[in-house]
Amino acid sequence: MEKEKLIEEINRLKEERNAIIMAHNYQLPEIQDIADFLGDSLELARKAVNIDADVIVFAGVDFMAETAKILNPEKTVLLPTPRATCAMANMLTIKHIIEAKKKYPDAPVVLYVNSSAEAKAYADVTVTSANAAKIVGKLDSDVVIFGPDKNLAHYVAKVTGKKVIPVPPNGHCYVHRKFTLEDVERARKLYPNAKLMVHPECEPEVQEQADIIVSTGGMIKRACEHDEWVVFTEREMVCRLQKLYPSKKFYPAREDATCIGMKAITLNHIYESLRDMKYRVEVPAEIAEKARKAIERMLEMS
């Protein structure tokens, strides 16, 4: 089916099913273009609270679709393909959390939303890269257990001055781990007038070279501050920024900074998922109830 016809059919099915499409900033441009809501993890979580639709098609990775389902237990949530997974979320196990709690029984468990629903059920609060430092700073504890991203944990510790225990010790995003000091040096040489916007999932040594350290939502908000930027996150963010700020220049720090899970979703997947109402996201009620408390606490605190 041709692209124009595919989009036409998706829109027809959306109306027929009373569906909306939520998409993350890392999605392919053609999916960003058809999304009803587009944003980072925090923005999408906020949007998911009061959705006026019967069906949510989530163009993101699995943990994001799970979060939408947890916040909307009565609605149908579709993940267009089961291949849209997050490797980092799968690095954190329940065993990691239980072992950390044995060592630090009084420390609250703070989990990045990039985690499974089962893990979130053990959390005191969830966070996103946009609000992690703010929320940890508000907690009445000088020690927190934080997972699964060790680099975001480093950033939070630096901003808050608190002791942040990463679980697992080497949890990371393989896309952001690609960025190195060599990329920083190359960016400075190629684009001497540009500033560097760096995602806090990047390695600490790369964060230290940043002009600003921000989530993808923060990148959108702060891009107005300068005319040229080198973007240290998933490459599709450059497309999003360029559309929002056509008069400014944005350069990907690496052309190969690609999230396989995010790119697993195509227009055809969205069409087939809506047509057949397949790949429904389900979260067991007991897990969802516990995880919902941690997510709702995040939304209240941010």
UniProtKB/Swiss-Prot annotation:
Chemical reaction(s) catalysed: iminosuccinate + dihydroxyacetone phosphate = quinolinate + phosphate + 2 H2O + H(+)
Alphabetic keyword roster: 4Fe-4S, Cytoplasm, Iron, Iron-sulfur, Metal-binding, Pyridine nucleotide biosynthesis, Transferase
EC number: 2.5.1.72
Cofactor: how bound: Binds 1 [4Fe-4S] cluster per subunit.
Any one GO CC term of the record: cytoplasm
Binding site for [4Fe-4S] cluster: 86, 173, 259
Entry annotated with the keyword Phosphoprotein: no
Subcellular location: Cytoplasm
One annotated GO molecular function: metal ion binding
Pfam family for this entry, one: NadA
Residues given in the record as iminosuccinate binding sites: 24, 41, 112-114, 129, 199-201, 216
Record GO biological process: 'de novo' NAD biosynthetic process from L-aspartate
Family: Belongs to the quinolinate synthase family. Type 2 subfamily.
Role: Catalyzes the condensation of iminoaspartate with dihydroxyacetone phosphate to form quinolinate.
Protein name: Quinolinate synthase
Chain's gene name: nadA
